[in-house]
């Protein structure tokens, strides 16, 4: 297996950065091994609220860790090294063509199967007919910086903070994990994103949640919400996983768990194909994705059909209730506690 990426490794990745126990289980992650020299921050609660003056926050606590804060530069690199793949960092995909039953990559690599895992702008996704522009994206900006010992940041590492836009079309986060703090904001559509981000940072500072001395260069990211603009998942000798396939969760925008699970499902299908990689041999992957994440019908989400004033009232009711915040916003939308972990065992597909 050969992995090519135009970025060097370890590399930064725009991401709030936490994984649930279900992800750790699916990856068979050895937590004791991973936490040696890496960030692995237990999360036992969340502070949630709405962006605006005079809003009351809700703090939800759990008796045991429900997630673990990680840094993507460490997490991705660890998994890549563990995979045993041949890695060619700093290598962009400049050519991809089909010759018979094989792919020719950059005029030097021959392979019977290509897996597109390059995020929203993955060139393999474009080759399959996805990512051509006009897709309804979620846009996000964030920064992650080390915290000096002298900097007084009131955000507790075990309790990340999530603050939602009044129209529920975006939210921001402030997450302190060991020696760094990660701050960001994501929203449906990219219109006026910079203004929304600036407003969120001003809100955090006015509330005393983020010291004025804690600042960093904002980095941007875009991704598709699952079902809003379905991309082709498979073709002859090719399939897409993660953000390249547009699998991010609709309510939270999380992409880590869908990426991990789609990768495991893809691996199972490839093993089951036994060297036959035509479209019909890889079609079980598409069916398994829909069985796991739901139908890909491209219908607009409910939140985009409801008038803004109704959404504001709904958001106030849900986010103002400790019970609804725990059961709906956190347990269901962010933690997906209702969905069991995907088995790490890769069984050949029927």
Go through each PLM region and give its residues.
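Glycine-rich FAD pyrophosphate-binding loop
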Residues: 1-15
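Hydrophobic "anchor" residues on beta-strands that sit immediately upstream
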Residues: 1-2, 108, 112, 239
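Short, solvent-exposed loop/turn segments at secondary-structure boundaries
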Residues: 13-16, 129, 186-188, 251-254
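A conserved beta-strand/loop capping segment in the N-terminal third of enzymes
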Residues: 18-78
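Short glycine-enriched, charge-decorated loop/helix-capping segments at active-site entrances
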Residues: 63-67, 130, 254-256
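Predominantly flavin-linked oxidoreductase catalytic cores and closely associated redox partners
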Residues: 81-212, 228-232, 246-247
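FAD/FMN-dependent oxidoreductases across multiple families
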Residues: 95, 191-270, 275
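C-terminal helical "tail/cap" subdomain of flavin- and related membrane-associated enzymes
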Residues: 268-350
